[in-house]
Regions:
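Conserved segment of winged-helix/HTH DNA-binding domains
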Residues: 76-103
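Internal catalytic or translocation cores that form aromatic/hydrophobic pockets or channels
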Residues: 40, 54, 69, 87-91
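Beta-hairpin "wing" of winged helix-turn-helix
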Residues: 65-78
């Protein structure tokens, strides 16, 4: 089951990390690719026709933002890292409301 990230405008560091992750067209393409797939870095690189080093960097940024999860699994020669979408919904309250107790 995927998660929901709900932020307020006061969660500046987390919003900055997510905004950075979403600011790249390549990272948006990776998110679309991982929408229904769990892939390793070489599969992402091959499908998007980019160097593996670029794919690894983009996935790392997406992972640091909390949008993607990467887990090591046994592979043919050692282990490989599989990446998938961690979050299916993101919302940011720009004007959060507060409950004020009445006297």
């Amino acid at each position: 089951m995927k998660n929901t990230i709900h932020l307020s405008i006061y969660d500046t560091e987390q919003i900055s990390n997510i905004a950075k992750a979403l600011s790249s067209e390549q990272r948006l393409k990776i998110l679309k690719l991982l929408d229904d797939n769990v892939l390793n870095i070489s599969e992402v690189a091959a499908r998007l026709k980019m160097p593996m080093s670029s794919a690894a960097l983009h996935i790392k940024i997406l992972e640091e933002s909390g949008l993607v999860i990467t887990q090591p699994v046994p592979g043919i020669r050692g282990s490989q890292k599989l990446s998938g979408i961690k979050v299916d919904h993101l919302s940011i309250d720009l004007k959060p409301s507060y409950n004020v107790d009445s006297p």
